[in-house]
Design a protein with these regions (language model features):
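Proline-centered loop/turn at the N-terminus of a beta-strand
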Residues: 19-21, 46
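Short, acidic/turn-prone active-site loops that include or flank metal/cofactor-
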Residues: 25-28
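Short Gly/Thr/Asp-enriched flexible loops that form oxyanion-binding sites at enzyme active sites
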Residues: 7-18
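C-terminal binding/interaction regions
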Residues: 30-107
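Short, small-residue-biased leader/transition segments that mark boundaries at the very start
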Residues: 1-3
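Short acidic loop-to-helix transition motifs that present clustered carboxylates
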Residues: 5-7, 30-31
Length: 107
C-alpha cells in the first residue's frame, strides 16, 4: 500500500463482504494520520485495524480467522501460540538467572 493510500482498507471494506485488515504505515505524524484514516469507518463498514507497521499481527489475525473453519490450520495456530509462550518462559528463566551487583550511593 502506498503511504498516501491509507484510505484503501476502507474502500475495500465498502466493496466486499469479506473481512478487511488495515495496517497503518508510519510516515508523517508517526503514523497517527494513517491510523485515523483506517479506524474512523462509518457504521456497517468495519476494518480490523492493526498497530502502526503491524503487518505481522495482520497476518496472524488472518490465519486465526481462516482457522475457525479449518481444524488443521487451527492446530498449527495453537502450536504457534504455544511456541511464543515457550519463548517467553525461556526468556524469563534466563533473565531470572542474571545477577547484578549494585553499589549503593548515599544522597
Amino acid at each position: 500500500m502506498c503511504i498516501r493510500d491509507s484510505h484503501l482498507p476502507g474502500v475495500i471494506a465498502a466493496m466486499t463482504p469479506l473481512p478487511v485488515i488495515g495496517v497503518p504505515i508510519k510516515a508523517s505524524l508517526e503514523g497517527f494520520d494513517s491510523i485515523m484514516s483506517i479506524v474512523q469507518m462509518p457504521p456497517g463498514i468495519p476494518v480490523a485495524t492493526m498497530a502502526v507497521n503491524g503487518a505481522m499481527n495482520a497476518g496472524i489475525l488472518a490465519v486465526q480467522m481462516m482457522a475457525t473453519g479449518d481444524a488443521e490450520l487451527m492446530q498449527k495456530m495453537i502450536q504457534y501460540k504455544e511456541s511464543l509462550k515457550q519463548k517467553i518462559v525461556k526468556a524469563n528463566k534466563e533473565l531470572s538467572e542474571v545477577k547484578y551487583k549494585f553499589k549503593r550511593i548515599e544522597i
